[in-house]
Amino acid sequence: MITTRDIAERLGVSVSTVGRALADDPRISEETKFRVRQAASDMGYVGNRAARMMRGASSNVVALVIPDIRNSFYSTIAHELSKNMEAEGFQLMLSETDDDRTAELRHLRELSANRVAGVIIVPTARPHSESVKLLRALPHLQLLRRHPSLGSQWFGVDDHEALRRATAHLVAQGHTRIAYLGGPEELPTGAERLRGFRSALREGGLPDDAGRTALGPPSSMEHGRETVRRLLQGPDTPTALVLGSIQLTLGVLEELSGQGVKVPEELSVVGFGDEPGFSWWGPGLTTTGLPIQEMATGCALWMMRRLKTKPSNDGPYTSVSPGSLVLRGSTAPPAGGKARSGAA
């Protein structure tokens, strides 16, 4: 088995330099890190922990790389994936990036060194080129977010249609001042959800300035709280909100409850995702329901099939879940207004 001493002898550097370079120590120059990693890859070096994993049998570990396990959306996916993979003799390993592409790269380096069987990833907005190369060398698929450089295997939600449907419901109720709180456009999911929001406004014959947008970290409850606080204090207060992530929804609901805002009498709200508490929050939250369990199960089955059949190359595969609008009591025509004819 190749050791750090072998790499050091090949490159003419010390063993400690090799170890620090592989650990991404900031004291080592980028040029030296590159030379060490390249030599390690060429020589088939496996790190100490990976070596322990690899003694005996080949890896049966599949990695799930996500932004934040505290987001119940991702924790539910992790649970369903783990359950399905365990039934097939595989184990799920979890890595969190906090939507930081450097953290993403660090995890992918480790996963590659550990020779995991495959990777399921919710990619950051702009993965490093090295991350792309590492993933291309592993069986992988993208989940929810889709980055063109990472291949064409993807499981996700029709984000455009989900937000178009949610916004169209508010337009049909007669709202003309609608605010959208969602993730940044640099994220594929954020861009598609914003596009769906704007599509519904256009289809409803509303002018561009009928919709206000507040884009920010999709996993930040604080962003939801601060944004809705600002919207309610400013001029031309919206009569309706449509939300583009679960964490933003949680933050908004917390702020509305704290301020005593009457929903839907003073403000209509359409959330995102369908957490257990959403059905009994206030009048019951109208929200975009997502088939998380079904999507995770399909994702696990695809990966298991891919690992067991080991095709010579992966053809494109896309699975799009439509989502649904769950109607409850948090939406109504604006005060002094009325729903359009045929509104749900």
Task: Specify the residue positions occupied by each region the protein language model found.
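Alpha-helical recognition/docking segments in bacterial nutrient-uptake
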Residues: 2, 60-168, 172, 233, ...
